Design a protein with these regions (language model features):
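Short, conserved micro-motifs composed of acidic
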Residues: 75, 79, 91-313
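Alpha-helical segment of the N-proximal tetratricopeptide repeat
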Residues: 1-21, 25
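Canonical tetratricopeptide repeat
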Residues: 35, 68-69, 102
Length: 313
């Protein structure tokens, strides 16, 4: 019960520890092993996820287990074995979009790897031991999303809150940082953005229009909005997209935000007339799909449309 409660609260690190203790005590039912594998899958511990999915996959006819096992094998570089299990997934779910895509070109991975040899990938020295991602350039600055802030919220020249960890992965909540781009192309002068942008909850994945206005994702806890799960009685935040105006830094939620579903990960077209974003709104093809919408003169998003099954699975 303890492990299941932690899992239902999306506290996957704690839940994995609890399920592992049960297994160590001899309770290695398929349910517990499956829950442990799912925990590792959700925090992207690919080695442990592969290990525990492997104990289930051989005798399983559950397409979800087979698919996730294949994905973890692929993530760990075991491409031939991954393809073997994807073929089994195809047998179980031949009409699934993932099966159709795989069967069109089952040996696509060597092609991708071959193309990758044309590029030089470097690990930047601005990376931390925490999650760092979502880099975007604007006005000679690099903006990233990071969970490196272990101290608190900075405001009025001082740190004013104790930082808490996010139960999903036991890392601090995400914030937005900026770096200056030097003449040599390196990134210097790390800056934690102020409290009208960063709150004690998640913010991230900044994008900019031609006027320098920032669009980013923020948790709805910021506006005291949440969803209550009737089964677990947990409260869960939604995600929304907010626009921070250049100059007065006024923060406004976009008209596509909803109390029924999340919208997140904004990205603007080069002409600033189209917003691309992801959402789990009804009518999609999967969990979160990618959508586009037109930005009008008032900044509202209109004519929202799903990008279709060639993009969304």
């Amino acid at each position: 019960k303890k492990a299941d409660k932690q899992f239902s609260r999306l506290e996957f690190v704690k839940a994995s520890e609890s399920y592992k203790k049960l297994i160590d005590k001899g309770n290695s039912s398929d349910y517990i092993v499956g829950q442990l594998a799912e925990c590792y899958y959700n925090i992207f511990n690919t080695v442990e996820a592969e290990k525990w999915y492997a104990t289930l996959a051989e005798d399983s006819t559950d397409p979800d287990i087979i698919f996730k096992y294949s994905q973890m094998l692929k993530a760990n570089g075991k491409y031939k074995l991954s393809n073997k299990w994807m073929s089994k997934f195809v047998e179980l779910r031949p009409a699934d979009n993932r099966s159709t895509a795989f069967m069109k070109d089952p040996n696509y991975l060597p092609k991708i790897i071959s193309k990758g040899k044309r590029f030089n990938v470097q690990n930047l020295d601005i990376n931390s031991e925490y999650s760092d991602f979502g880099g975007t350039l604007n006005n000679n600055k690099l903006y990233i999303t990071s969970s490196r802030n272990t101290v608190g919220l900075f405001d009025i020249g001082r740190w004013i809150t104790q930082r808490i960890s996010y139960g999903w992965n036991n890392e601090p909540y995400l914030d937005v940082y900026s770096f200056d781009v030097s003449e040599s192309g390196s990134y210097i002068n790390e800056d934690y953005l102020d409290s009208n942008i960063n709150t004690k909850y998640h913010e991230g994945l900044a994008s900019f229009d031609a006027n320098g206005n920032m669009y980013l994702t923020r948790e709805s806890f910021y506006e005291n909005e949440y969803v209550e799960d009737p089964e677990s009685n947990n409260i869960t935040s939604l995600l929304g997209i907010y626009k921070i105006s250049v100059g007065d830094k006024n923060v406004v939620g976009l008209n596509i935000n909803s109390v029924e579903y999340s919208v997140k990960n904004p990205s603007l077209s080069s002409d600033g007339k189209t917003l691309y974003f992801s959402s789990d709104m009804p009518g999609g093809f999967g969990n979160f799909d990618i959508y586009r919408g037109d930005i009008d003169e008032k900044g509202d998003i209109n004519n929202v449309e799903n990008l279709g099954q060639k993009i969304n699975t």
